[in-house]
Structure formats: structure tokens, C-alpha cells
Design a protein with these regions (language model features):
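Long amphipathic alpha-helical scaffold segments
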Residues: 172-191
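Short, flexible helical or helix-coil boundary motifs
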Residues: 15-18, 167-170, 193
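Cysteine-cluster motifs in flexible loop/terminal segments that predominantly coordinate metals
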Residues: 187-232
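Long, charged N-terminal interaction/targeting segments
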Residues: 31-171
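Ordered core of a single globular domain
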Residues: 1-22, 30, 34
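Short Fe-S-cluster ligation motifs
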Residues: 179-181, 237-241
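Extended non-catalytic scaffold regions that mediate assembly and binding
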Residues: 27-31, 35, 105-111, 136-140, ...
Length: 241
């Protein structure tokens, strides 16, 4: 699985330009889960991450390369108890998985399953608002959660715990960034991940290898492994017929 490897390398190169704090990973101390999405009124909120005119983004990358030995939570910028006002925000997840094999349909299914995890994490007092079209993500933090000691280590552990429930996931790296220059620099990679997602959907909805007339040809040409996945799926369809 090489689809996201170039983006992962570029992301980490950008992240490492900043002061990166490696937070402890203690799944037993993950933040309590609300069980479902909650709505926080403005009057009950301490502040927002990525709110107002502040930039925000999220994206998830998958790799079978051995890039970490254990789960990781990385932070660029202040931790939640240190924040007093609205700040920029990015949350990036990198998943190291088992070998997903050569079956393109199985690879696609596994990627989609892992992507959907982010819609099922509900830290109490941590209200997430997504925009899948623009890759934006804003978070509203409740005064009560802040009073009880919510932190990125606890929230990151909640995400890791949920991702580890997905089949094939070996290790999870969750990166939180709260510096405007860092968030802005990563926006192009969020766009590239979105392009890959749209291209995968297009491939599996239109299993034809007529690359010359495909709107997604640019992405297939640029992303290592995408064209092989598409052609492999087309051959599999031909064999069935």
C-alpha cells in the first residue's frame, strides 16, 4: 500500500520543522466517550479549535511501511489546558497497517473502514464539526471538560483506541497542530488526500481502464500505486466476465 507514502513523508518533514512534543500514550487514560455526538452551546464552551477565521484541517493516511514501533501522539503548539482563546487547528492521523494484500477491492474496503472511524469518536465535552468537502475540522471544548482536565494525550488516546479496533491496524500516529504556519503549510497535503479518496471512489464506481478519457488521470499519474490498483481491478472484472 503506497498510495499515501509520499504525503506521509512530506507531512512529517513539515511537522518536524516545528517544536514537536511527544505525549504519553496511555489507552487506559483515554478521555471518556460520550457514546454519540453531543451539541455544545456557545455559552458552555471554553474556546474553539480552528474556529472563526483560524485555519483548520484534518486528513488520514494509510501505509504498510514500518514507520513506527508503537502508537504515538504528537503535539505542535499548546495543550488544551494552556489555551485561552480560539486557535488554528489540525488533526492528522497516520495508520500503519498489516499487509493488505494485492486484492484492490479488499484494499479499498479496508481504507474506507479506517476512514470512517473518525466519525465514531465522541470525547465528552469535545464537539467536532467536519467538512469533508474542504477537509476542515473545528472543535468546541466545553468548560466542564477543561475543568476536569481534558488534554490532547487523553483525546489522542481515545482516537487510537478506536482505530485499533479496525482490522489490520498495527499502530496509530495522531498529530495535533495549533500553530497557524504549520496548519497552513499542510493544507496542500489535505487536498492531495482528498483527491486520492475521490479517485478511489471513481475507480470503484467506474471499473474501466480507459485512462485517456478519465477525469482522474492526473491523480493516477502522480500517486504511486494508484494506476496499478485501477488496472488490477479492471483485469479482475474482465476475468469475471
Amino acid at each position: 500500500m503506497r498510495l499515501y507514502d509520499t504525503i506521509i513523508d512530506a507531512t512529517m518533514a513539515e511537522v518536524e520543522k516545528h517544536n514537536v512534543k511527544k505525549l504519553p500514550v496511555e489507552l487506559s487514560r483515554s478521555w471518556p466517550d460520550n457514546g454519540s455526538a453531543e451539541f455544545l452551546m456557545q455559552r458552555d464552551s471554553a474556546f474553539e479549535l480552528g474556529g472563526g477565521s483560524n485555519p483548520s484541517l484534518h486528513y488520514t493516511c494509510v501505509t504498510t511501511k514500518r514507520i513506527m514501533e508503537s502508537d504515538e501522539i504528537l503535539l505542535v503548539g499548546p495543550d488544551l489546558p494552556e489555551i485561552k482563546e480560539e486557535v488554528p487547528f489540525a488533526r492528522i492521523v497516520i495508520l500503519q497497517t498489516e499487509d493488505l494484500g494485492d486484492d484492490s477491492e479488499e484494499q479499498h474496503r479496508a481504507i474506507r473502514e479506517m476512514e470512517f472511524v473518525r466519525y465514531h469518536v465522541f470525547p465528552k465535552g469535545y464537539m467536532v464539526r467536519f467538512s469533508s468537502m474542504s477537509s476542515e475540522e473545528q472543535v468546541r471544548i466545553s468548560k466542564e471538560a477543561l475543568h476536569k482536565g481534558i488534554s490532547f494525550a487523553a483525546v489522542g488516546a481515545s482516537y487510537i483506541r478506536k482505530y485499533r479496533e479496525a482490522a489490520n491496524v498495527k499502530h496509530v500516529r495522531v498529530i495535533f497542530l495549533l500553530q497557524a504556519d504549520a496548519v497552513t503549510a499542510l493544507k496542500p497535503y489535505a487536498g492531495k488526500v482528498n483527491d486520492i479518496t475521490k479517485t478511489l471512489t471513481h475507480i470503484f464506481d467506474n471499473i474501466l481502464a480507459d485512462c485517456g478519457h478519465c477525469d482522474m488521470k492526473r491523480v493516477c499519474d502522480e500517486v504511486d500505486g494508484m494506476k496499478e490498483m485501477h488496472l488490477g481491478l479492471a483485469k479482475k472484472k474482465d476475468r469475471k466476465e
